[in-house]
A protein has these predicted regions:
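N-terminal accessory segment detector
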Residues: 1-99, 109, 114-126, 141, ...
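Short, aliphatic-rich beta-strand segments
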Residues: 101-105
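Ligand-binding pocket scaffold of soluble enzyme catalytic domains
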Residues: 132
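Conserved SAM-binding loop
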Residues: 157
Length: 166
């Protein structure tokens, strides 16, 4: 008889993990061909933004139907992302505040995956850097002082409006 087992994560997170597997394969292939590690990491970062940037941009454009305010839209979008894509075993603690979209990620399966593959340095380029590009696309700045990828206990996300010149 066929036994059905439940996958360890949702379809959305499963898709992201599969894409990260492709990142590891491309990174290793680039290194095997003699590409310097820094250049291979930049290659992954560039390609990932080309893949993930357009749907993130579309989501932000559609969020205009909810509000004209960038922070309201960013809060709605990050909540949606954690409901659909960044599901368990991701763990997030939201910090209610009026001047920012603030939350901490306390468990990151992407950082764990890259570490388990022996390429923890790839996490920053394949995943973390996209957060800053996403914030810029939304007209916000991401203030982050620590990441799990850098061996901290959490990733602190603070999406804030850009500082305006005085």
């Amino acid at each position: 008889s066929i036994q059905h087992t439940r996958p360890p994560h949702t379809l959305g997170l499963g898709l992201i993990i599969r894409y990260m597997e492709w990142d590891v394969a491309l990174y290793r292939a680039a290194l095997e061909q003699g590409m310097p590690p820094a250049k291979a990491c930049l290659l992954i970062e560039t390609i990932n933004w080309q893949v993930f940037g357009p749907p993130i941009e579309l989501g932000f454009k559609l969020s205009r139907l909810r509000s004209a305010k960038a922070l309201v839209r960013a809060r709605w979008l990050t909540d949606l992302m954690f409901a659909v894509m960044f599901t368990k075993p991701f763990a997030r603690t939201v910090h209610p505040t009026s001047g920012a979209v603030a939350f901490d990620v306390t468990a990151c399966p992407l950082a764990n995956y890259f570490k388990s593959q022996g390429v923890p340095e790839l996490t920053r380029h394949a995943a973390c850097s996209l957060d800053h590009q996403m914030a810029a696309q939304w007209g916000l700045q991401l203030q982050r002082t620590q990441t799990i990828a850098q061996e901290h206990p959490l990733c602190d996300f603070r999406f804030v409006p850009p500082k305006t010149p005085q």
